[in-house]
Swiss-Prot record:
This is Trypsin CFT-1. Belongs to the peptidase S1 family. Residues 25-256 form the Peptidase S1 domain. Responsible for the activation of delta-endotoxin from Bacillus thuringiensis. Disulfide bonds join 55-71, 180-197, 209-233. Residues 1-17 form the signal peptide. It comes from the Eukaryota. Its EC number is 3.4.21.4. CDD domains: Tryp_SPc (cd00190). The keyword Cytoplasm does not apply. It catalyses: Preferential cleavage: Arg-|-Xaa, Lys-|-Xaa. It is found in: Secreted, Extracellular space. Transmembrane segments: none annotated.
Length: 256
């Protein structure tokens, strides 16, 4: 799920509140996996018996899923399963066991810098109209400010709400890096060059939220971001924060 910053009473210091293993698109609408066939629901289990959607990801090839490191820290691979080819979070499609979790070696649990990970499936991910590898941004991908981007996921439709059983999507916009950095300094957050901010700045009401963590952010059908963290969800002043995929292209290609 997406990590949120919580304000400490009567001061501007903040902490990264590590969420429960669960996080929805705010302000979006329902869609289908046929429209976003690279999307995958990542299922977590506390007891290794019952698995439910907790994070999202994007299919990279027949064996690998791109997601966010913070979803998996401290977890054995058998606590996670991968659902591909389904519009629904907890039914349909094909469910794969996870063979390996690869966390970026420079992931920082405090700042959430380098918040990127790859899950390897124990079985082959078949390709069809409901499950297809995503295109990812190259190292020189040019993404300007105020560009329309699309987020998808099964996360909360409002802060503190339950997840959405049906896949949802929302159009938001890229936010200037310096603007995002200065806004988050107000609440103790650190925006690095490895991060990409998106939302509806100074308006709010549209965002990724808890349960959308690890899910892809698309620009012209290319994955440019991986849902990471933010100050609550869909606030006008504070956009959502993603891992910037173009900063990790070589690492993704080497490990996928």
């Amino acid at each position: 799920m997406r990590v949120t910053l919580a304000l400490v009473a009567l001061c501007l210091a903040s902490v990264a509140a590590l969420p429960e293993k669960q996080q929805r698109i705010v302000g979006g609408s329902v869609t289908t996996i046929e429209q976003w066939p690279s999307g995958s629901a990542l299922l977590y289990s506390w007891n290794l018996v019952t698995y439910s959607q907790a994070c999202g990801g994007a299919i990279l090839n027949t064996r690998s899923i791109l997601s966010a490191a913070h979803c998996f820290i401290g977890d054995a691979a058998n606590r996670w399963r991968i659902r591909t080819g389904s519009t629904w979070a907890n039914s349909g499609g094909v469910v794969h066991n996870t063979a390996l979790i690869i966390i970026h070696p420079s992931y920082n649990t405090r700042t959430l810098d380098n918040d990127i990970a790859i899950l390897r499936s124990a079985t082959t991910i078949a390709q069809n109209n409901q499950a297809r590898p995503a295109s990812i941004a190259g190292a020189n991908y040019n993404l300007a400010d105020n560009q329309a981007v699309w987020a998808i996921g099964w996360g909360a439709t409002c802060p503190g709400c339950a997840g959405s059983e049906q896949l949802r999507h929302i159009q938001i916009w890229t936010v200037n890096q310096n603007t995002c950095r200065s806004r988050y300094l107000e609440v103790g957050g650190t925006i690095t060059d490895n991060m990409l901010c998106s939302g509806w700045l100074d308006v709010g009401g549209r965002d990724q939220c808890q349960g959308d963590s690890g899910g892809p952010l698309f620009h012209n059908n290319v994955v440019v971001g991986v849902c990471s963290w933010g100050q609550s969800c869909a606030l006008a002043r504070y956009p959502g924060v993603n891992a910037r995929v173009s900063r990790f292209t070589a690492w993704i290609q080497a490990n996928a």
